[in-house]
Each structure stands twice: as structure tokens, then as C-alpha cells.
């Protein structure tokens, strides 16, 4: 591996360990030329399916975009950043498990709605109202009835 300080191509691995979450190998290295030390990480490269939008265009999957849309729905709701990240990870695991090269954005939207429903009913309704493009109050009422019936409250 090339030294980031002097560019020399010979480095020595001093220590190799698994990261805490087990998804990376951490290596401590020393440059044989300048004697400086640095750390490298080796991770699995995951390939998410391309997202096919309603207009037929294709975009790369972007975790940040998914996180932004979920955070918007969860704004001012009592849900931790950690819980949001865990939900996004579950969505990503489902996307990878599909084994497809492309998936429609509607499928991602449905996965997001399922996770939001588990996290916070209000956020679920907020997201559903935008995602499903509610045209009138009756559509809103239908989703409210569905959520309250599912939680045993009326």
C-alpha cells in the first residue's frame, strides 16, 4: 500500500483487527521509507440496485437521500438518530436481498412506509400523505383509520 505521507510503495502491516461491528478489517501500517504510521480499513463493497423513478429515469441509490426523507417525516418526533439509522439499515438489507439490478422507487417508498409505521405513526401518516399524493380529506381519513385500527385505538 502506498504511504499517504511520502508516497513510498512499501509499507509494513503492524496490526490487523476486525472492527467492532465486524464489517471491516482495520490495519495499522508503517511506512518503510518515512517511518510514519497510518490506519487503513478494508470493507465489502455493496452494490445497491438502481432506482427507477416514476418518469422512467434511473438514479443511483443514495442512503443520504433516504435518510433526509425519513428525517423530514420524523421532524420534531421522539425518535432517535440511532433508530432512524437502524431502520435505514433494515431497508438496505431488504434492497440487497432482492438481488435485482433495478427497482422502482415505489418499492423503496413502500419499504420506507413500513419502517416509519413501526417507528412513529405520525411520521408514517406524514410520509404517506406526500408519497401517496392525497387529493382530499377522505384519503387522509382512510390512512388514519388504518393506523388507529392497527394499533387498537379509536
Curated annotation (Swiss-Prot):
Binds 1 zinc ion. Its cofactor is Zn(2+). Residues 49-139 form the ATP-cone domain. A zinc finger (unnamed) spans 3-34. PROSITE patterns: ATP_CONE (PS51161). It comes from the Bacteria. The keyword Iron does not apply. Keywords: ATP-binding, DNA-binding, Metal-binding, Nucleotide-binding, Repressor, Transcription, Transcription regulation, Zinc, Zinc-finger. One of its GO terms (molecular function) is ATP binding. One of its GO terms (biological process) is negative regulation of DNA-templated transcription. Belongs to the NrdR family. HAMAP family: NrdR. Negatively regulates transcription of bacterial ribonucleotide reductase nrd genes and operons by binding to NrdR-boxes. This is Transcriptional repressor NrdR. It comes from Cupriavidus taiwanensis (strain DSM 17343 / BCRC 17206 / CCUG 44338 / CIP 107171 / LMG 19424 / R1). The lineage of its organism: Bacteria, Pseudomonadati, Pseudomonadota, Betaproteobacteria, Burkholderiales.
Amino acid at each position: 500500500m502506498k504511504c499517504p505521507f511520502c508516497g513510498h510503495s512499501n509499507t509494513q502491516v503492524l496490526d490487523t483487527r476486525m472492527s467492532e461491528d465486524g464489517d471491516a478489517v482495520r490495519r495499522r501500517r508503517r511506512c518503510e521509507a518515512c517511518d510514519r504510521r497510518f490506519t487503513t480499513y478494508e470493507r465489502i463493497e455493496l452494490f445497491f440496485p438502481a432506482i427507477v423513478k416514476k418518469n422512467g429515469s434511473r438514479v443511483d441509490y443514495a442512503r443520504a437521500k433516504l435518510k433526509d426523507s425519513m428525517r423530514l417525516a420524523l421532524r420534531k418526533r421522539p425518535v432517535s438518530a440511532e433508530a432512524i439509522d437502524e431502520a435505514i439499515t433494515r431497508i438496505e438489507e431488504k434492497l440487497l436481498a432482492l438481488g435485482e439490478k433495478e427497482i422502482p422507487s415505489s418499492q423503496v417508498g413502500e419499504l420506507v412506509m413500513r419502517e416509519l409505521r413501526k417507528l412513529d405513526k405520525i411520521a408514517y401518516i406524514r410520509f404517506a400523505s406526500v408519497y401517496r399524493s392525497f387529493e382530499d380529506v377522505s384519503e387522509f381519513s382512510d390512512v388514519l383509520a388504518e393506523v388507529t385500527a392497527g394499533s387498537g385505538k379509536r
